[in-house]
């Protein structure tokens, strides 16, 4: 028996007030529908049917590289009609799991529990109890047994008082699902083909119906406007922050970080407020992240420190290395063990060796820098001639004085010293002192210009 997942994603989302299809609006680092697709894949599904309609080009551009069966719903005539479009792709012996592209927070564990309670030849529906069930289809029971689902607009006063509601998520045997869908009618207040009507059909046919509930109601909430989208974003962030804390991170304020990717944390990690994580980020043990830092696709080793307002993108920090405040590490940058860059230092596609330091106001691009090197303030590796990039090599123990320009390609030998204000255009041998600045002149009796009166 195979698991065949149908994801409904055909709606425009008019209340979003956007040209973007509703399901492509993002939660954290990926679209709502991508969250749902990823969850479906985590269940080991044999196939995923994506029912689409509005914004087909944008959907296919965003999702087209994935293993999806694209099912067109040319007219939006209700949820039952949407699922019916996938009938040709459903086998009789499939278990069909129906999900929604605008319900991104549904968890794998919740769906596994739903599938576990589905009878062999029956169906299982995911329900939730809400204090205010307005707008939702009510679960109608008789002597505890589910006999149907009644939509809000079709419900009477007694049914409106029910607070157990339908989430729309259900697991259904393929053979019966196709038969029930073919029997649907649009004779209702909306003039639509309701998927929920198959519950009453199942009851009439004597098919066993079971229910399951999510761990929290937020899992089954959708986003129809940007306010609801923001609420789901906050819920996602709270869940992600909780996961980080359980893994060993100390968050100064869990409500004031943003996690837009996959973050792995070691023990005793300290994270201050307003930090943003994007992409794949790995934090070792005892790492400290200062306020306002941005970490993107980076690897931070044990005991390293990212000081406030530092940007680390596509870079690596070794053990006990530190960066910032107000530093920028661009893709390809690597700080080896105990290396340090300070405020207003930018490093790109370069390695700063063990124990080496660039304390402030420097640009290090396309550079290979050894161990124990001191980079003075105002130092620049001039790596670009307007057409090509070139490498600067600085070997172990070099002292680079302030305001030095190294015009690549150039190599500075071990333990060499470069005088402040020098422009280095030729290789420097080991242990040499090089000074290229103009000789200082003293002009006595110098008169400053006087401002001309107009």
UniProtKB/Swiss-Prot annotation:
Gene responsible for this protein: glmU
Enzyme class name: transferase
Function of the protein: Catalyzes the last two sequential reactions in the de novo biosynthetic pathway for UDP-N-acetylglucosamine (UDP-GlcNAc). The C-terminal domain catalyzes the transfer of acetyl group from acetyl coenzyme A to glucosamine-1-phosphate (GlcN-1-P) to produce N-acetylglucosamine-1-phosphate (GlcNAc-1-P), which is converted into UDP-GlcNAc by the transfer of uridine 5-monophosphate (from uridine 5-triphosphate), a reaction catalyzed by the N-terminal domain.
Binding site residues for acetyl-CoA: 377, 383-384, 402, 420, 437
ATP-binding in keyword set: no
NCBIfam families with a match to the protein in the record: glmU (TIGR01173), PRK09451.1 (NF006986)
Stretches for region Pyrophosphorylase: 1-226
Localization, UniProt: Cytoplasm
Positions annotated to bind Mg(2+): 102, 224
Any one of the GO BP annotations: cell morphogenesis
Annotated binding of UDP-N-acetyl-alpha-D-glucosamine, by residue: 8-11, 22, 73, 78-79, 100-102, 137, 151, 166, 224, 330, 348, 363, 374
Subunit structure, as described in the record: Homotrimer.
Name this protein carries in UniProt: Bifunctional protein GlmU
Active site: 360
Pathway: Nucleotide-sugar biosynthesis; UDP-N-acetyl-alpha-D-glucosamine biosynthesis; N-acetyl-alpha-D-glucosamine 1-phosphate from alpha-D-glucosamine 6-phosphate (route II): step 2/2; Nucleotide-sugar biosynthesis; UDP-N-acetyl-alpha-D-glucosamine biosynthesis; UDP-N-acetyl-alpha-D-glucosamine from N-acetyl-alpha-D-glucosamine 1-phosphate: step 1/1; Bacterial outer membrane biogenesis; LPS lipid A biosynthesis
The record's free-text note on cofactor binding: Binds 1 Mg(2+) ion per subunit.
Cofactor(s) it depends on: Mg(2+)
